[in-house]
Amino acid sequence: MRSGFIAHVRFDENGEPIEHWLDDHLRDVAKLAAEFADLFGADWAHTAGIWHDLGKYNPEFQAYIRHKTGYERENAHIETAGRVDHSTAGASYAVEKLGVAGRILAYLIAGHHAGLPDWHQELGSGGALKKRLENKTHLQKATAVSIPADILAAPNLQPPALARQAENFALWVRMLFSALVDADFLDTERFMSEAKFNQRGQYQSLTHLREVFNDHMNTLAINAKPSQVNEIRADILRQCREAAEKPVGLFSLSVPTGGGKTLSSMAFALDHAVKQGMQRIIYVIPYTSIIEQTAQVFRTIFGDENVVEHHSNTDPDKAEKENAQSRLATENWDAPIIVTTSVQYFESLFAARTSRCRKLHNIANSVVVLDETQLLPPEHLKPILRVMRQLSAHYRVTQVLSTATQPALKTQLDPFGRVEREGLDDVCEIISASETLYQQLERVRLELPDDFQTSRSWEELAEELEDYERVLVIVSRRQDARDLHALMPKGTYHLSALMCAQHRSQVIDEIKRKLKTDESVRVVSTQLVEAGVDMDFPVVYRAMAGLDSIAQAAGRCNREGLLSDKGKVVVFIPPKPSRGLLGKAAESGVSMLAALAGQTLESLPPQMFTQYFDQFYNKLNTLDKAGINELLMPDNQLGDCQFRTAALKFRMIEDGDTYTVFVKFDEKAAELLATLESMGPERWLMRKLQRYTVTLYGYQFRPLL
């Protein structure tokens, strides 16, 4: 029996209003949310769905949607200041009917438009949940009318075992929130824009994509030239396929740079996902420059339609070709293969906003490949490791820690056996005898400075570098790259984040072309080339840094092992030391290598990286600088959490005193900027302009005014 209350309104081709009935909307959202939360709390998601819009039964809301708006399209769904509050009523009803357990639903329902709230006073805008629940007016008005009994029925909900552990509570609530929000968006979209809704979910299965991948790998194997490096890569691939037979859990893939991690990890992910009945593969990569490269590799294999690239710097030319389906998939990650940034992935796992949280339920029952794990931000390492433990333990997520320099992520005990640093335990290493593998892939000699306390001048280095026709120099600071580049011979390339992404992409393509044709090419770059950018130089210079950075720099030298002798990597002390985390990393690197001053090393053994990361982490005052874990631990058994404050404080990249500058780099940028001036900051436009932005610190920006 339909009660005649309206949830949303759309208009037909004649401008006549068509109603989306509230009873139908609540039941359909409940059903869909329960499906999304099948692994971790279907009954909770169902109840949240059926109560989320109880406030729309309020006669004031019905009058608003029927009369005040005149059925205006743009006002039919979005709740903003000045509109009738329709989310507090359902939250209050949950607490009234279920007591303390109802608070969990209250977080979801109260936040389903504005985002998950804090229990107590918030840092950001919006009312804290505790205060909102004290106001019973919204509930009284909504329940004063006749509502179907099945919608008001209160089930007997008991939190699952995982949610009874305090450290698991916040992620569980966020996962439920994701299921509710995505279900609400999709059901509304199904009514408001059926054509858009029907474009979703039309993907090939992972089973089919595995067949496509296997055909591609067979072709590569047939055409591969015989070499020791290719033999080693084939063995790495074999071991990845064997490890894929193991149960869901945590894995590490410790392979030296140039060992073919990208394709081997995809082989593992596909085989494992198909065997375990998983729904998607998510690649998490630290830098957008690597994402573009990796996503292109996967698109070539699987086709554009099956790979979704989700980050800010999408190429505008590709964006023109981007279909509606891939744009929609970035909203909730329902595609089979997702390639995204560490920032997007981890900030979503700690988010409060609906747009960020919406995708979370689709991380469950997936394979997540975390590329370049050594770049996990140490200031947030504790909360990141906690959420990683939970994903594998409770949400059927297999995580692969893929890097040439595995960080020290195991739980550390003090001399008395007490936990000193929580970490990841029971991690299965995919590659057997990885130390032997590192020795087999030794392709460089590492020359250390005679004295780690004495710096070299840029002038001295520039003069020395002129002797090489093909050389890459990597420094840690953008200003260092500028200073050295200014002293280098004409034609030397510069790469840093002071260039917009479009400019960097063009320069990288030009460098790669010259490397292939054996032309003279000198490059001065910041560390943005260290992780995953496929360049191969005979000589690489690296300013003193952490051991992981030195190893990554070495990965740009004699990458394919084609030199008659080994490549040459020179570590030098720059004129000015780095500050902050980079400075502490360099200090830890010096303390590890100081006893070897003046020596030439054949390799950096894997165990040295474990010791280095232990020392580096111990140098830091805290591995949870923002206190995220404390904010997300319920104060008591009542579930008092500070979701919004934690989301605001969890920032992989500190905003600080920074400014975004648009660069009129080419004709495309000029056109986009002209459109910006005439139209203002439309979302689609700002997305395209991302590739033409540079972030400046205040001290760099203010002199430009």
Task: Place the predicted regions along the sequence by residue.
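Interdomain hinge/linker at the junction between the two RecA-like core domains of SF2 helicases
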Residues: 405-466
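Walker A/P-loop
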Residues: 247-269
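C-terminal helicase lobe and adjacent C-terminal extensions/tails of nucleic-acid helicase motors
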Residues: 42, 392, 459-468, 474, ...
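Conserved Walker A/P-loop ATP-binding site and its immediately adjacent core
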Residues: 270, 278-301, 314, 408
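Inter-Walker segment of RecA-like/P-loop motor cores
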Residues: 303-350
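Conserved helicase motor
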Residues: 9-11, 288, 309-322, 475-479, ...
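SF2 helicase catalytic motif II
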Residues: 342-346, 356-394, 399
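Accessory nucleic-acid engagement/destabilization modules that flank
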Residues: 1-216
